[in-house]
Amino acid sequence: EGNTIYESDGQTGQSKILKYTLGETNATTFTAQPADVFSEGSTIVGNKVYQLTWQNKKGFIYDKSSLKLLSEFPYPNVMGEGWGLTYDGKNLIASDGTKNLYFLDVNDPSKMVKYISVAGNTEVYDQLNELEYYNGFVYANVWQKPIILKINPIYPLIF
């Protein structure tokens, strides 16, 4: 965002959320997670940063400026893991390593608004990983494949 880079750095026992100035290699600030957490996707919503954990079935909400932990939230029961996270201007959109994208209430991310299953003309894609929302589409990479999907979030087709 602007000249600031936010990074969700995952590794059990070493996970953290970091903030960098563009072009710099040292973080200006960071917040470490508990040792049992493997952090995954993150996204910015207003003055907050939302972050998922891989298998802990919870996410974190931070103050964007200080990266101070504001709160935690449990995943909706249908989400198995936390992989990627983005924001479409209304809802958080999360992936869990399956073919599904979960639309979560930004004011209460433990509540699922809806979910979609992603498919192309001839193939169903699973292991949806990192997510980005841009110009009305969700972009998702497929884990360990050189594929980036362009997904219509209203009619979950691939372009």
PLM features: what roles do these ranges have?
Residues 5-32:
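Beta-propeller domains
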Residues 14-17, 58-59, 100-102, 146-148:
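Structural signal for beta-propeller blades
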Residues 20-25, 63-67, 106-109, 152-156:
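Short loop/turn segments that connect beta-strands within beta-propeller blades
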Residues 25-33, 68-75, 111-123:
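A short beta-strand motif characteristic of beta-propeller blades
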Residues 32-78:
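Glycine/small-residue-rich loop that forms an oxyanion/phosphate-binding "nest" at active or ligand-binding sites
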Residues 94-129:
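Histidine/lysine/aspartate-rich catalytic loop segments that bind and position anionic ligands
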